[in-house]
Amino acid sequence: MQWQDQAIILGVKRHGETSVIAEVMTRGRGRHLGLVRSGRSRAMRPVLQPGNAVEVVWRARLDEHLGEFRVEPVTLRAARLMDTATAVYGVQAMGALLRLLPERDPHPHLFDALEVILDHLHNPADAGELFVRFELAVLNDLGFGLDLAECAATGARSDLAYVSPKSGRAVSRSAGAPWADKMLLLPPFLGVEGNHAADVDSLAAAFRLTGFFLHRHVYEPRGIEAVAARDGFVQAALKALNPASQTLSSPNGVSA
Protein backbone atom coordinates (compact mmCIF):
# COMPACT_ATOMS: atom_id res chain seq x y z
CA MET A 1 0.00 0.00 0.00
CA GLN A 2 1.30 3.45 -0.89
CA TRP A 3 -0.04 6.95 -1.39
CA GLN A 4 1.25 10.52 -1.55
CA ASP A 5 -0.46 13.68 -0.33
CA GLN A 6 -0.11 17.24 0.93
CA ALA A 7 -0.02 17.41 4.71
CA ILE A 8 0.33 19.72 7.69
CA ILE A 9 2.19 18.57 10.78
CA LEU A 10 -0.05 18.43 13.87
CA GLY A 11 2.38 16.81 16.28
CA VAL A 12 4.95 14.08 16.87
CA LYS A 13 5.53 11.48 19.55
CA ARG A 14 8.88 9.91 20.31
CA HIS A 15 9.22 6.29 19.20
CA GLY A 16 12.38 4.46 20.16
CA GLU A 17 15.76 6.17 20.17
CA THR A 18 15.71 7.90 16.80
CA SER A 19 12.21 7.72 15.30
CA VAL A 20 8.89 9.47 15.89
CA ILE A 21 5.25 8.83 15.16
CA ALA A 22 4.02 11.85 13.23
CA GLU A 23 0.42 13.03 13.25
CA VAL A 24 -0.52 14.98 10.14
CA MET A 25 -3.61 16.43 8.52
CA THR A 26 -3.61 15.38 4.88
CA ARG A 27 -5.71 16.99 2.22
CA GLY A 28 -7.22 13.81 0.79
CA ARG A 29 -7.01 11.29 3.62
CA GLY A 30 -7.76 13.27 6.74
CA ARG A 31 -5.83 13.03 9.98
CA HIS A 32 -3.25 10.28 9.70
CA LEU A 33 -0.44 8.79 11.77
CA GLY A 34 2.77 7.24 10.53
CA LEU A 35 6.27 6.30 11.65
CA VAL A 36 9.08 8.59 10.56
CA ARG A 37 12.43 6.85 10.81
CA SER A 38 15.23 9.13 12.04
CA GLY A 39 12.55 11.69 12.82
CA ARG A 40 14.59 12.95 15.78
CA SER A 41 17.62 13.73 13.63
CA ARG A 42 18.95 17.28 13.33
CA ALA A 43 17.75 17.37 9.74
CA MET A 44 14.18 16.23 10.44
CA ARG A 45 13.40 17.95 13.74
CA PRO A 46 12.82 21.39 12.15
CA VAL A 47 10.62 19.81 9.46
CA LEU A 48 8.38 17.91 11.86
CA GLN A 49 7.21 20.97 13.81
CA PRO A 50 3.45 21.69 14.16
CA GLY A 51 2.13 24.01 11.47
CA ASN A 52 4.66 23.10 8.80
CA ALA A 53 3.36 22.12 5.37
CA VAL A 54 4.96 18.98 3.95
CA GLU A 55 4.56 16.35 1.27
CA VAL A 56 4.22 12.84 2.64
CA VAL A 57 4.51 9.41 1.10
CA TRP A 58 2.88 6.71 3.22
CA ARG A 59 3.75 3.04 2.87
CA ALA A 60 2.45 -0.04 4.67
CA ARG A 61 1.89 -3.69 3.92
CA LEU A 62 -1.80 -3.42 4.82
CA ASP A 63 -4.07 -0.39 4.93
CA GLU A 64 -4.90 -0.87 8.62
CA HIS A 65 -1.23 -0.79 9.65
CA LEU A 66 0.42 2.29 11.13
CA GLY A 67 2.77 2.50 8.18
CA GLU A 68 5.75 4.75 7.54
CA PHE A 69 5.97 8.31 6.26
CA ARG A 70 8.62 9.76 4.03
CA VAL A 71 8.41 13.50 4.64
CA GLU A 72 9.58 16.33 2.39
CA PRO A 73 9.33 20.00 3.49
CA VAL A 74 7.13 22.41 1.54
CA THR A 75 6.49 25.46 3.76
CA LEU A 76 8.38 25.67 7.05
CA ARG A 77 6.31 28.23 8.96
CA ALA A 78 6.75 26.80 12.48
CA ALA A 79 9.43 29.31 13.52
CA ARG A 80 7.24 32.34 12.88
CA LEU A 81 4.28 30.59 14.52
CA MET A 82 6.21 30.94 17.78
CA ASP A 83 6.23 34.75 17.56
CA THR A 84 2.75 35.50 18.95
CA ALA A 85 0.45 34.02 21.57
CA THR A 86 -2.39 33.73 19.06
CA ALA A 87 -0.18 31.61 16.81
CA VAL A 88 1.20 29.38 19.58
CA TYR A 89 -2.23 28.68 21.06
CA GLY A 90 -3.96 28.60 17.68
CA VAL A 91 -1.84 25.76 16.30
CA GLN A 92 -2.51 23.67 19.41
CA ALA A 93 -6.23 24.46 19.49
CA MET A 94 -6.80 23.60 15.83
CA GLY A 95 -4.93 20.32 16.26
CA ALA A 96 -7.25 19.47 19.15
CA LEU A 97 -10.30 20.28 17.03
CA LEU A 98 -9.11 17.99 14.24
CA ARG A 99 -8.63 15.18 16.77
CA LEU A 100 -12.38 15.28 17.41
CA LEU A 101 -12.83 13.84 13.90
CA PRO A 102 -12.28 10.17 13.09
CA GLU A 103 -8.76 9.27 12.01
CA ARG A 104 -8.31 8.78 8.24
CA ASP A 105 -11.63 10.49 7.50
CA PRO A 106 -11.06 12.97 4.63
CA HIS A 107 -12.04 16.60 5.14
CA PRO A 108 -10.30 18.51 2.33
CA HIS A 109 -12.12 21.78 3.10
CA LEU A 110 -10.77 21.68 6.66
CA PHE A 111 -7.27 21.11 5.32
CA ASP A 112 -7.64 24.15 3.06
CA ALA A 113 -9.06 26.23 5.92
CA LEU A 114 -6.21 25.15 8.20
CA GLU A 115 -3.63 26.35 5.69
CA VAL A 116 -5.35 29.74 5.41
CA ILE A 117 -5.54 30.19 9.18
CA LEU A 118 -1.90 29.21 9.68
CA ASP A 119 -0.91 31.96 7.28
CA HIS A 120 -2.99 34.55 9.17
CA LEU A 121 -2.29 33.70 12.81
CA HIS A 122 -0.03 36.75 13.09
CA ASN A 123 -3.10 39.00 12.65
CA PRO A 124 -5.42 38.57 15.68
CA ALA A 125 -8.51 40.04 13.99
CA ASP A 126 -8.23 37.78 10.96
CA ALA A 127 -7.10 34.80 13.02
CA GLY A 128 -10.01 35.09 15.46
CA GLU A 129 -12.65 35.26 12.76
CA LEU A 130 -11.09 32.43 10.76
CA PHE A 131 -10.79 30.28 13.89
CA VAL A 132 -14.49 30.73 14.70
CA ARG A 133 -15.41 29.70 11.16
CA PHE A 134 -13.11 26.69 11.53
CA GLU A 135 -14.95 25.64 14.70
CA LEU A 136 -18.27 26.02 12.88
CA ALA A 137 -16.97 23.83 10.06
CA VAL A 138 -15.81 21.16 12.52
CA LEU A 139 -19.22 21.21 14.22
CA ASN A 140 -20.87 20.80 10.84
CA ASP A 141 -18.65 17.86 9.90
CA LEU A 142 -19.45 16.22 13.23
CA GLY A 143 -23.16 16.48 12.42
CA PHE A 144 -23.95 19.49 14.62
CA GLY A 145 -23.93 22.31 12.09
CA LEU A 146 -25.62 25.60 12.97
CA ASP A 147 -28.19 27.16 10.65
CA LEU A 148 -27.39 30.86 10.55
CA ALA A 149 -28.97 31.67 7.19
CA GLU A 150 -32.55 32.51 8.19
CA CYS A 151 -34.79 33.06 11.18
CA ALA A 152 -36.12 29.83 12.67
CA ALA A 153 -39.41 31.53 13.56
CA THR A 154 -40.19 33.70 10.53
CA GLY A 155 -37.86 32.64 7.73
CA ALA A 156 -36.49 36.19 7.51
CA ARG A 157 -32.92 36.51 6.28
CA SER A 158 -32.21 40.00 7.59
CA ASP A 159 -31.64 41.49 11.04
CA LEU A 160 -30.64 38.12 12.48
CA ALA A 161 -29.45 38.83 16.01
CA TYR A 162 -29.65 35.62 18.01
CA VAL A 163 -29.07 31.87 17.91
CA SER A 164 -31.37 29.50 19.75
CA PRO A 165 -29.35 27.42 22.24
CA LYS A 166 -31.83 24.58 21.73
CA SER A 167 -31.98 24.33 17.95
CA GLY A 168 -28.76 26.02 16.86
CA ARG A 169 -30.77 28.13 14.40
CA ALA A 170 -30.68 31.87 13.87
CA VAL A 171 -33.49 34.07 15.20
CA SER A 172 -34.32 37.61 14.08
CA ARG A 173 -34.14 40.51 16.49
CA SER A 174 -37.91 41.01 16.61
CA ALA A 175 -38.80 37.32 16.92
CA GLY A 176 -36.21 36.71 19.61
CA ALA A 177 -36.81 39.85 21.66
CA PRO A 178 -39.14 38.20 24.24
CA TRP A 179 -36.46 35.57 25.00
CA ALA A 180 -33.37 37.69 24.42
CA ASP A 181 -31.91 36.86 27.83
CA LYS A 182 -32.01 33.14 26.98
CA MET A 183 -30.55 33.48 23.49
CA LEU A 184 -26.96 33.39 22.27
CA LEU A 185 -25.87 36.45 20.34
CA LEU A 186 -25.23 36.07 16.61
CA PRO A 187 -22.24 38.28 15.72
CA PRO A 188 -22.93 40.38 12.61
CA PHE A 189 -19.85 39.05 10.81
CA LEU A 190 -21.35 35.53 10.89
CA GLY A 191 -24.65 36.66 9.38
CA VAL A 192 -25.75 36.01 5.81
CA GLU A 193 -24.87 39.55 4.78
CA GLY A 194 -21.27 38.91 5.83
CA ASN A 195 -20.19 42.53 5.36
CA HIS A 196 -19.23 43.32 8.95
CA ALA A 197 -15.70 43.23 10.32
CA ALA A 198 -15.12 41.42 13.59
CA ASP A 199 -14.45 43.67 16.59
CA VAL A 200 -13.64 42.59 20.13
CA ASP A 201 -17.30 42.36 21.23
CA SER A 202 -18.53 40.42 18.21
CA LEU A 203 -15.51 38.13 18.35
CA ALA A 204 -16.12 37.40 22.04
CA ALA A 205 -19.76 36.59 21.23
CA ALA A 206 -18.65 34.31 18.40
CA PHE A 207 -16.24 32.40 20.65
CA ARG A 208 -19.03 32.02 23.21
CA LEU A 209 -21.38 30.74 20.49
CA THR A 210 -19.07 28.04 19.15
CA GLY A 211 -17.83 27.18 22.63
CA PHE A 212 -21.39 26.59 23.82
CA PHE A 213 -22.24 24.14 21.04
CA LEU A 214 -18.88 22.36 21.17
CA HIS A 215 -19.41 21.82 24.89
CA ARG A 216 -23.02 20.72 24.50
CA HIS A 217 -22.69 18.41 21.51
CA VAL A 218 -19.10 17.19 21.68
CA TYR A 219 -17.18 17.68 24.91
CA GLU A 220 -19.93 16.93 27.41
CA PRO A 221 -21.25 13.76 25.66
CA ARG A 222 -17.69 12.45 25.27
CA GLY A 223 -16.77 13.30 28.85
CA ILE A 224 -13.85 15.50 27.82
CA GLU A 225 -12.85 19.12 28.29
CA ALA A 226 -11.84 21.72 25.74
CA VAL A 227 -8.06 22.00 25.61
CA ALA A 228 -6.53 24.88 27.54
CA ALA A 229 -5.06 26.14 24.27
CA ARG A 230 -8.53 27.24 23.15
CA ASP A 231 -8.92 29.52 26.14
CA GLY A 232 -5.38 30.75 25.57
CA PHE A 233 -6.15 31.56 21.95
CA VAL A 234 -9.43 33.28 22.79
CA GLN A 235 -7.86 35.50 25.42
CA ALA A 236 -4.82 36.29 23.26
CA ALA A 237 -7.00 37.24 20.29
CA LEU A 238 -9.31 39.43 22.38
CA LYS A 239 -6.44 41.07 24.24
CA ALA A 240 -4.69 41.89 20.98
CA LEU A 241 -7.83 43.66 19.74
CA ASN A 242 -8.50 45.34 23.08
CA PRO A 243 -5.83 45.20 25.80
CA ALA A 244 -8.51 45.96 28.42
CA SER A 245 -10.63 42.91 27.52
CA GLN A 246 -11.24 40.36 30.27
CA THR A 247 -12.01 36.64 30.34
CA LEU A 248 -15.62 36.16 29.26
CA SER A 249 -17.77 33.22 30.31
CA SER A 250 -21.22 32.16 29.24
CA PRO A 251 -23.90 31.63 31.89
CA ASN A 252 -23.31 27.87 31.82
CA GLY A 253 -19.62 28.30 32.59
CA VAL A 254 -18.27 27.67 29.11
CA SER A 255 -15.46 30.08 28.32
CA ALA A 256 -16.05 32.54 25.53
Curated annotation (Swiss-Prot):
Database matches in Pfam families: RecO_C (PF02565), RecO_N (PF11967)
Any single GO CC term annotated in Swiss-Prot or TrEMBL for this entry: bacterial nucleoid
GO biological process, one term: double-strand break repair
Source organism, top-level taxon: Bacteria
Keyword DNA damage on entry: yes
InterPro entries, per database record: ARFGAP/RecO, DNA_rep/recomb_RecO_N, NA-bd_OB-fold, RecO, RecO_C
Keywords annotated in UniProt: DNA damage, DNA recombination, DNA repair
Entries under PANTHER family matching the protein: DNA REPAIR PROTEIN RECO (PTHR33991:SF1)
Function: Involved in DNA repair and RecF pathway recombination.
Family the UniProt entry places it in: Belongs to the RecO family.
NCBIfam families given in the database record: reco
Descriptive protein name: DNA repair protein RecO
Organism: Rhizobium etli (strain ATCC 51251 / DSM 11541 / JCM 21823 / NBRC 15573 / CFN 42)
Gene for this chain: recO
